[in-house]
Amino acid sequence: MPAAAAVGSSLLPPQLHGLLGFALADSMHADHVVVVTDNLVPFPCLPWQIQGNYVDQVVEVEQVGLPEKIVSGTTQITKSPDRLLIAEHCAKFVRDAGIMKDGFSFQAGAGGTALAFAIYLKEMMIEAGVTAGFVRGGSTKYLVEMLEEGLTPVILDGQTFDLEGVRSMRENAGHQNTSPFTSYNFHGKGNFASMLDVVILGATEVDTDFNANVVTHTDG
């Protein structure tokens, strides 16, 4: 099966979709790699995540997709009072347990509750005068706001969940792309998942051994 992805110019208009970190492994190990794009640019195509030495063909199409559709239901803040309360309690725990201090790090996923957590935590950081050492993406406009308001010097990004994340990746030197090799690879010497102080992610199922299902709903 070919591995298909757009080129690194996906950070530039007209078609924006952001980072390709999770497609990087596919491009390196697939038998055949096809890059699909509607935005051919002169060499070199910067920034590049998928390098040309892994690519067999580049296919130009009229339109890859609709950038405004990047934002889906899972990348919008929850309106559920129960989930907002969960998010607030999580942020208060991080603060009251002493985890929220200068130089701490956190990851907030794209789920509605995790996004709300980031907003509550941001308010508490401002109130306490605390800045993070780094923040782990997937990036959203809420993490971008923290970067641009000086609450963190760096976003280490693995996915781009909205157009503000794409813009920030293009414009902010402190917004850096990453791949699963450096993020979550248990055998990687530079694996920074274990460096995170706080991780707030959504899951449809969690068992008593803390194994989490984030792929399918409970009905399969």
Where are the predicted features?
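Conserved phosphate- and dinucleotide-binding cores of soluble alpha/beta proteins
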Residues: 1-105, 116-125, 129-133, 142-220
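Glycine-rich beta-strand-to-loop/alpha-helix junction loops that act as flexible
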Residues: 108-117, 137
